[in-house]
Each structure stands twice: as C-alpha cells, then as structure tokens.
Amino acid sequence: LIRRDFSRCIQCGRCIAACNEVQVASAIPYPYGRREERSNAPTGWYPVPDYDKCVYCGECVQACPTGALQDKKACVIDLDKPLKKVRTTCSYCGVGCQIHLHVQDDRVVKVTGVEDAIPNRGRLCVKGRFGYDFIHSDDRLTVPLIKENGSFREASWDEALDLVGRRFSEIKEQHGGDSMACLTSARVSNEENYLMQKLARGGFGTNNIDHCARL
C-alpha cells in the first residue's frame, strides 16, 4: 500500500509524529526514543516501521512533505493532466469521516482526509484511505440479477422489484411478519436506515430489526 523512497527523506519527523501522536500505533520509533531529539537522527537513519504494529492507516503518507512515503496506487496519477478534488463522506462505517476523492479521467486515483472537518480532522483508517478499488471494479454489479435454474440472468429494475415484493408478500401470508428480520448497514445514511426500519415495521409487520454496528 505504501511506497518508500528514502532518497527523498529529509528526516523531518512528521511521519513519526503522525504515527505516534495521531494514530498512536507507535509503529515508527523515534531514533533515540524521544521526539525532541528527532532532529539529531544518525546519518543513514530512516523511519522504517515495525510492521507488527503498523495498521496501514496511511497517516505517515499524508504527513510526508517530500514524497518519501507515497500511496502506491496513487503513483498512476498523470501530472500533466488536471486532477479534480471532490469532497464526500466515507461509506465504510457510521463515523462519517470526511474525505477528498482525487479524480482524474473520471477515475478515483487517490483518497485523502479533509483536514479541517469533523469528525476525523483529516485522519483515516486503512479502508477509508486505500479501499477505493471497488469503485471501478469489473466485478461490481451494474444491473439487477435474478437467479433461475441455478444461474443468474440480467433483469430490469421493475421486474426485480416486482419479484422481491411478491416473494415478501408470500412469506408474510404463509408465516407471518415475525418470520422476517431486517439487518441494516453502517455503510448507508441515517435516513436510509430509518426508512429500512419503517419498511420492516409498517410493511413487513416485524420488530426484528438489527444493525451491523452492534455485531
């Protein structure tokens, strides 16, 4: 995930401070064990992490001012082409971290945290910073699929929704509303979670509702 080019390292210690004081992973040690002595690093010393402690959050990458530490996947950025920055909310959990998507040729090529925004103040976990490959994955579903005779076929949204509604109605009629349950996701908004519980209670007639954040 992280490319290291120590020929660019100026031993400023920002990566060490990010790791020890922001992420509190202590994966990159101070050369003499104390921050105030980091400017006295021995010749040839570079911030090599303890991989057993590293959580690959990328804080060191975002803090590095020279490019000695870089996001490997961001190395595809063409410096001769414009780079658009789009602010959005990370969808991996319910914290709501604010992120910048760096977009080039209609593809996300890098993700950074928004420094002046709560709740994360620019900080991200490994998923939020590096887990964006799914956006352009060839395996990503783009149309509804219906399983027939052991295989899936493409269907229209109207056909798929009609089938789902019909099957839910059949289950409710045969077994009652309490035979069904809803498990909602931290990757959707509060409003969508609210609508899901409303569907469960008002449509299915069940109070069997849970959320992945509790698991």
What kind of region is each of these model predictions?
Residues L1-L215:
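N-terminal export/assembly segments and adjacent metallocofactor-ligating motifs
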